[in-house]
Swiss-Prot record:
Tissues/organs with expression: Expressed in leaves.
Domain of life: Eukaryota
Catalytic activity line of the entry: chorismate + L-glutamine = 4-amino-4-deoxychorismate + L-glutamate
UniProt remark on domains: The PABA component provides the glutamine amidotransferase activity.
Recorded GO CC terms: chloroplast; cytoplasm
Organism of this sequence: Solanum lycopersicum (Tomato)
NCBIfam families: pabB
First and last residues of the transit peptide: 1-47
Keyword Chloroplast: yes
Chain spans, region PABB component: 415-889
Protein name from the UniProt record: Aminodeoxychorismate synthase, chloroplastic
Residues annotated as the enzyme's active site: C171 (nucleophile), H306, E308
Pfam families found in the cross-reference section: Anth_synt_I_N, Chorismate_bind, GATase
Subcellular location: Plastid, Chloroplast
Length: 902
């Protein structure tokens, strides 16, 4: 590291800004307790305490020795900031809260996050210069270009006018720094998303203690299609970092063994070109690419790569260095004036006057009372905790356990069919862990129309074409007696469900000793179009099915597949003590021992060709149109509008009389999955047969939030040898790794909105999981939920699942709405439970047959990136429809065969 260069660059920026000292006024503020409120939909409270000025022996850089006054200052202790206050500008990106988490750790307090069009310049000026609320500014990545005013918002004016405030721009923010000073923003040699490069730098303070150059260990993740043309840089902008080679790098931990490489050369027919892979990385056109700039006389820096990515090395060090730049900048300004200004500075920097800001933020925030922590058996003690309009419900849960008895009564399939399968299994549910290998899932939950607390919710978004309606939607509620009431939810379904869950009171002792997290509550689905309640302005298409359907279930049977145990649960009003329903369930289970397990109807075992599949199912899009849409996605990516777009389509087939439960039983055998599900909503003439391998989001009783996105899929091989080769091909695929990483960073962002600072982590990155028909690439992201965030806050922060949208999420969903010619409906949404104690577990609705009004539909698609081959994407989409479509056709074939024999 060139320390001289580091010192000189810091001095050059700071000293040139000393002339602006009169612009920025400082006043003496007495230390006092304060409350920091950050913006994460729910307000985040900072601990009340007096801010202290710590004294350290740190000396300002040696270039100050030339001045007698400054030399004297060198020998005096200087203040060290306990925390740094950052204004984080969000350019509608899906990685902003990864930056938020890093800054929260490094700065000692959370930054305030605002969208780039949320505050006027007058408001920004007020907080920056009149209230002196912030010490520095970070400008996030985002879709689009800095040349488009709607993409960049207020950021250009910040960069142009805030000459005396440290600013760090990331990706789009970096490009904006170049553009505002006259540099040209052009297309990169190639779009570069979710891939790694080695970086070399000039040793300036931003890269302090970070190695430089090829094989130095400084690997970074890049997400960009546009770059600053280095030839157009004005003299006031200094290049400080570049890609060190024209090569992409493999991810750490992903290695190609010699045996695999040798085998691939011998099996060219299997690998379809995989033999071309080698240890040498693919060359990038155009050579080195500019990766960082700084202003010669302002404390402004830009980074083209993403320091916040989970796969970037030294990312946290970069943010630490920016904090240090901020501290040194203000300390240097202080040292150029009178001693009394130093005292004023110390007080000013340490005690922000945040009251006006807090009031402004509070107007926008969604404040959630800390209701989740209430745990009492006394109803009277909790009446004041409910939301207005939602009466308090004190729930009592009782349960019994039948040890090692599931197999004795025919297993999960027989239990469900015998207890809930009569009368077409109407109004029944089965969250079915039909694939339990490698502990992917352990419990199955099932039930039907239950006791007095049972009800069914059905919600449809309002028709935005109705000019009298500005959002919300229509809810119908059927109770246990069949009575239906309807109401309009002005604030939408998520708000209603949130208030419902927060209105429950209970005693934790009721479920002590149970090894699972669902004890009764809501079970059902949330459709993809409810994205309209999660930040998307509107839906272009309207779903034929309800946008959400859930049961409130008060009687549940749980099967522990690991130990073969059965649990019966009954939920009732706390004012009663009835256990008759629980005893009835237990007796019905015991009676099953005398029954012969119900056999699945005989199914045809032959395979189906693509021609036969097409003859049964009609596609919403032709092969030609789907490939054209893939190319359109790649054009959007090239223009910087998205990093990755998850394009989907639907297959449909009209059905005659069909036993939907029998179809599901066939599907679960043909394609067992850990997050499978059966749902029937008879009032809606709707059945859902789901064989999903993917978890969307889970919140357990210990407040641990987990997502398990799948990105990367390949067919299983016909022989063990071929199967292993295909598995390794997926593991080493640069395209699939890039897809997966983009979604991992997106989910880290979503969890970061509602999780405790520093708790979001990735315990498993890009692992391969194998299922009946495919291998998949899966990652796991976890975090600790904040105490002031509710279960619905967590879902709303991450819905729809990023693996079904792409990134940045909001812009990607808008683009996909224009490319896709129908609503996704239930597909791409989620199925699962919301327990009355706020725990939940939700899947991603894929590999699913939706049967509605006599029509079967199957959705499928894939993530489109710059590396995608349009023809391969079409084939991958067909591959994902294979299992559910085959289940439908086999079931139809068995019906025809049975009719012919009569």
């Amino acid at each position: 590291m060139n320390s001289a260069m580091s010192s000189s660059s810091s001095f050059m920026v700071a000293s040139s800004c000393c002339q602006n000292l009169q612009t920025r006024k400082y006043f003496l503020l007495a230390p006092e307790p304060f409350e920091k409120i950050g913006m994460i939909d729910a307000l985040q409270k900072y601990n009340r305490k007096e801010r202290k000025v710590f004294i350290s022996s740190h000396l300002v850089p040696g270039h100050l020795d030339a001045s007698g006054t400054r030399k004297k200052f060198l020998h005096e202790p200087v203040p060290k900031l306990e925390f740094v206050r950052t204004l984080l500008i969000d350019n509608y990106d899906s990685y902003t809260y990864n930056i938020f988490q890093e800054l929260s750790i490094i700065n000692g307090m959370p930054p305030v996050v605002i969208r780039n069009d949320e505050w006027t310049w007058k408001e920004v000026y007020h907080y920056l210069y009149e209230e002196r609320t912030f010490d520095n500014i970070v400008i996030s990545p985002g879709p689009g270009s800095p040349t488009c005013p709607s993409d960049i918002g207020i950021c250009l004016r910040l960069l142009l006018e805030c000459i005396d405030i440290p600013i760090l721009g990331v990706c789009l923010g970096h490009q904006a720094l170049g553009y505002v000073h006259g540099a040209e923003v052009v297309h990169a040699p190639e779009p570069f998303h979710g891939r790694l490069s080695d970086i070399e730098h000039n040793g300036c303070q931003l890269f302090h203690e970070i190695p430089s150059g090829r094989s130095s260990g400084f690997k970074v993740v890049r997400y960009h299609s546009l770059v600053i043309d280095p030839k157009s840089l004005p003299k006031e902008l200094i290049p400080i970092a570049w890609t060190s080679t024209a090569e992409t790098l493999p991810f750490q931990g992903v290695k190609r063994s010699n045996s695999f490489l040798n085998a691939s050369k011998e099996n060219k027919d299997i690998f379809n070109g995989m033999s071309e892979l080698s240890d040498d990385s693919k060359d990038v056109k155009g050579g080195k690419v500019l990766m960082g700039i700084m202003h010669s006389s302002r404390p402004h820096y830009g980074l083209q790569f993403h320091p916040e990515s989970v796969a970037t090395c030294y990312g946290r060090q970069l943010f630490k260095n920016f904090r240090k730049i901020t501290e040194d900048y203000w300390l240097l300004l202080m040292s150029t004036s009178f001693n009394e200004r130093r005292a004023h500075y110390a007080a000013c920097m340490q005690v922000p006057n945040l009251d006006p800001l807090s009031r402004s933020v509070a107007k926008r925030g969604h404040l959630v009372n800390k209701l989740i922590e209430r745990r009492t058996a006394e109803v009277d003690g909790t009446l004041n905790l409910s939301h207005p309009g939602h009466s308090v419900k004190f729930l009592k849960m009782t349960w019994k356990k039948l040890d090692c008895s599931a197999s004795q009564v025919g297993g999960a399939d027989n239990i469900f069919c015998e207890l809930f399968g009569d009368q077409e299994a109407k109004n029944s549910f089965w969250l079915d862990s039909s694939s339990i290998e490698k502990e992917r899932a352990r419990f199955s939950f099932m039930g039907g129309k239950g006791g007095s607390l049972w009800k069914q919710l059905s919600f449809r978004l309002s028709n935005r074409s109705d000019r009298m309606c500005k959002g919300g939607g229509h809810l119908s509620v059927e109770d246990a007696n069949g009575h239906v009431i309807s109401k309009f939810l002005e604030d939408g379904f998520f708000d209603y469900l949130d208030k419902e869950l927060l209105s429950f009171c209970f005693d934790e002792k009721d479920y002590e000793g149970l090894p699972f997290d669902f004890y009764g509550g809501y079970i059902g689905y949330i459709g993809y179009d409810l994205k309209a309640e999660c930040g998307v302005a509107s839906n272009r298409h309207r779903s034929k099915t309800p946008d959400a359907c859930l049961f409130f279930t008060d009687n549940v049977i749980v099967i522990d597949h690991q130990y073969d145990d059965i649990y019966t649960l009954s939920l009732h009003d706390g004012s009663t003590s009835t256990t008759s329903r629980l005893e009835d369930l237990e007796q019905r289970l015991l009676n099953l021992r005398a029954f012969t397990p119900r056999r699945l109807q005989s199914q045809a075992s032959r395979g189906f060709s693509v021609v036969e599949l097409k003859s049964g199912f009609s596609a919403e899009k032709s092969r030609e149109q789907y490939i054209k849409d893939v190319e359109n996605c790649q054009e959007f990516i090239k223009e910087g509008e998205s990093y990755e777009l998850c394009l989907t389509t639907q297959m449909r087939m009209k059905l005659g009389g069909i036993d939907s439960l029998e179809l599901y039983r066939n599907l679960r055998i043909r394609n067992p999955a850990p997050y499978a599900a059966w749902l029937n909503f008879s009032r809606e003439n709707l059945s859902i047969c789901c064989s999903s391998p993917e978890r969307f989001l889970r919140l357990d009783r210990n407040a641990i939030l987990e997502a398990k996105p799948i990105k990367g899929t390949i067919a299983r091989g016909s022989t063990p040898k071929e199967d292993e080769f295909l598995k390794l091909q997926l593991e080493c695929s640069e395209k699939d790794q890039a897809e997966n990483l983009m979604i991992v960073d997106l989910l880290r962002n979503d969890l970061g909105r509602v999780c405790e600072t520093g708790s979001v982590h990735v315990p498993h990155l890009m692992e391969i999981e194998s299922y009946a028909t495919v291998h998949t690439m899966v990652s796991t992201i976890r975090g600790k939920k904040r105490s002031d965030a509710s279960a619905i806050d967590c879902v709303r922060a991450a819905f729809p699942g990023g693996s079904m949208t792409g990134a940045p999420k909001l812009r990607s969903m808008e683009l996909l709405d224009h490319l896709e010619n129908c609503s996704r409906g239930i597909y791409s949404g989620c199925i699962g439970f919301f327990s009355y104690n706020q725990a939940f577990d939700l899947n991603i609705v894929i590999r699913t047959v939706v049967i509605h009004e006599g029509e079967a539909s199957v959705g499928a698609g894939g993530a489109i990136t710059a590396l995608s081959d349009p023809n391969d994407e079409y084939e991958e989409m067909l591959l994902k429809t294979r299992a559910p479509i085959k289940a439908v056709l086999e079931h139809q074939s068995s019906i025809f065969s049975s009719d012919a024999q009569k």
